[in-house]
Curated annotation (Swiss-Prot):
Subunit structure of this chain's protein: Part of the 50S ribosomal subunit. Forms a cluster with proteins L3 and L19. In the 70S ribosome, L14 and L19 interact and together make contacts with the 16S rRNA in bridges B5 and B8.
Molecular functions per Gene Ontology: large ribosomal subunit rRNA binding; structural constituent of ribosome
Record-linked PROSITE patterns: RIBOSOMAL_L14
Name of the gene encoding the protein in the UniProt record: rplN
Name assigned to this protein: Large ribosomal subunit protein uL14
Sorted UniProt keywords: Ribonucleoprotein, Ribosomal protein, RNA-binding, rRNA-binding
Reported function: Binds to 23S rRNA. Forms part of two intersubunit bridges in the 70S ribosome.
GO BP: translation
SUPFAM superfamilies referenced in this protein's UniProt entry, alphabetically: Ribosomal protein L14
UniProt cross-references to InterPro entries, sorted A to Z: Ribosomal_uL14 (IPR000218), Ribosomal_uL14_bac-type (IPR005745), Ribosomal_uL14_CS (IPR019972), Ribosomal_uL14_sf (IPR036853)
Family: Belongs to the universal ribosomal protein uL14 family.
Keyword rRNA-binding tagged: yes
A Gene Ontology cellular-component term: cytosolic large ribosomal subunit
Length: 122
């Protein structure tokens, strides 16, 4: 469960290490974002020769949360931390690699590219 001011690790090779959620997209009164939701983020920590720089604003999709996601069969999948993948303005991933597992809930039309790049789909 991600809200404004939440810090997330970045699960791709864009060069960003940590981002800060500055807005949950999808309605004026929307407070929380879960797995598969799009948020607006600011880069707080970046590698020196990365594709993105500190202070830049991007869209991102949440791929892992510590809160987890409940499946239809009653099972619950949780992760150790919160992670996101940076997106461009067309909502396509900026990076060319994804690190760590992602969940099956991302298998919508919009995020099939992320699912195909991920090393493991839970």
């Amino acid at each position: 469960m991600i809200q404004t001011e939440s810090r997330l690790e970045v699960a791709d090779n864009t060069g960003a290490r940590e981002v800060l959620c500055i807005k949950v997209l999808g309605g004026s009164k929307r407070r929380y974002a879960g797995i598969g939701d799009i948020i607006k983020v600011s880069v707080k920590e970046a590698t020196p020769r990365g594709r993105v720089k500190k202070g830049e604003i991007y869209n991102a999709v949440v791929v892992r949360t510590a809160k987890g996601v409940r499946r239809q069969d009653g099972s619950l999948i949780k992760f150790d931390g919160n992670a996101a993948v940076l997106l461009n303005n067309k909502l396509e991933p900026i990076g060319t690699r994804i690190f760590g597992p992602v969940t099956r809930e991302l298998r919508s039309e919009r995020f099939m590219k992320i699912v195909s790049l991920a090393p493991e789909v839970l």
